[in-house]
Amino acid sequence: MAEYRLAMNAFESASWNCTSLILPEQPAPPAWLVRVETGLGKSHVGKAMIAAALKANPVLQIDYIVPGHELAEDVVADLAKLSVGAEVYRGYKQPDHRPGAPPEAKMCLDIAAYEDALKCGANVRQSICDLLGEWRCTLAGKCGREAQRLKRSRVWVYPSQTLYHKRPDFIPEADLLVADEKFIGGAVDSKVTEILLSDIAAVAGDYNGALVDILQESPGRRPLTRSTLVAKGVTADGARRMSKIELRRADVLVIQPGMAKTQRAAVVRDRGRSIKHARHMVDFWSEVAAFLDAGHEESGRIWIADSETFGFRPLKPVHDSWRTATLILDATAPSTELLSAVLGLHVEEKADIVAHWSPYVQTRQITGAQVGMRALGIRSDEKTGKSVIVDEGKRNRSDILRFIQARAGLIHGDVLVITYKTLVEEWEQAGGLPNNVRLAYFGNLSGLNDFENVAGLIVIGRLLPPVLEMEALAAVFSGTPVPESDRTWIERKDGTKRLGYAMVDGGILTASGAVVATKMFQHKNPTVEALRQLVTEAELIQAIGRARAHRRTRGATCRIDIVCDIPLPIVVDTVVPWDSVERGALGDMAGSGVWLNNRRDIEEAFARVSEYWARDAAKQMGRNPFKESILKRDFSPSGPASLVALPRRVTYQRAGERWHTNTAFALPHGPQDGATMREWLEDRLGPMAHVEVERLPMKHSALALAMAAKSW
């Protein structure tokens, strides 16, 4: 972590030079990106440096940005341990955490008024809280938002969405802003704003008339072009003037604090739509001006949807009121170009810090598994847009479930499984997972520290965002559509073509130095590719980072399975094909704590297992006898194996002359002595003539594992 500390010290010095004397001619404040591999403790070190800086500078004010409110609470708790007082900034609809507040209480006690203000696009505080000190909400004395305004702290912690709104006026300007993890997601609205012909025509003006003509003369859906605007006499300066005119029309207070609900409803009905349209037009004309200034021929943010509608999706950079020295800490940060566009400052990458993983972690990447969302039967519902599970893919889902069961049966301790949210929800509802399995899903991983002590981690699948969505997003960030030459068209079996990602050669790097060839997704356009990587590779790295592989010791080993073909910027110990891993009937047997080796005995002892899967399990067991078992293959005897509870070999013979001696394995959570093993076998297979459980050396036993965990 020495490199990280040096970067932090250098940033502190640079930011002090920026903030020590505030003069108009001073240069823009520094904005630094420090990439720190997940699990290295970047947040902990960053908070320690903040504590030291606050102690050294008694007037220093710091803003700390995290992805959400839950993580904000964790930051405040962590800073308290360092004797630093901090406050979480809470929005109107957030829970009120004040002592004595009802559990269901929100920060705002009149959410209906808040939502009415939003419908009008109004300034919320002036509309429903306090207007010039003369009109106040009748609930102000009990309100969590008003109580929050009285708080004072040198460190405020905010959810990242707050960056895209004006900074709270009651909090002193910050000298430093620390952004811990991603924040660019709030820069682009998920919904498209529609600018309707009827709303444009309702307001007089030459430029509005030009917009009406552009819509009515359009041959169909297409981007708004520079040549079209120039032909209609629209200039950048004229667009800026129109934005100011619309601002005067929009900046009208139509709702006041204390207004009755019926009055507000009438205002929303009569004036809300026109005022909100005016606010949209403020942004629309500002974007037209920026587009003409930029020199692009086609706009990536404004398009003609049809003869009566403009589609508009602006880039919302971080609000100017947050402009100060900024430090970005992120293991999977986007490119500095994207960060600069959103932050409004030139971002420099100052460090990219990686670390060696502990030798007490073994990583296996499993290729060739059918783990894409489509292969697993995960679809988007046409009506709701939500992901749902369909019958197609049932076989693949069953294979994955049985693999998890088999793997969890081999691991002494909790196993974290990370996969798609829809699949996690189905498993939570249907059950069937071993008791030592915990679940998490992609898209909800940043900053989570709940799983740093799991004994196993299984990452299944990968997110792959739709190409059209990523191209549309890239168009917003860059300001111009993706060129046709950057797109890849893939031919279907029926001869038609679909838009997709190119499949290019890639390689998975192993500890031996060998590279295992694989294929990887790639988009030709660098902005689209950067955005895709934030969803695919970055989320996989976040998932793997939950195991905190750098911090493992002899008493806290971990086995990581990555079940997908995507090459990642990590070194894995082994790469194996899906067909060779423990799964099928081994998963069905794992819950009982015993793996049988004989096909007929498997069928008899486990009613759910068919002849095909029983034969497959016997084949797997024959391929992986105890001396070369999956467990020993993962952990060499000279390494962490001495502290892993290995399966015990069991030899048994059923009563009667026609039965031969067979082999089984007692898993770490299964029967561990002759008496319980005999009972297990006789319950399922009938009387036994002979049962013998192998005695393991003390170093391989579960007891040794528990003792080691306490001593290290």
Regions found by a protein language model. Give the residues of each.
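ASCE RecA-like P-loop NTPase motor cores
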Residues: 1-712
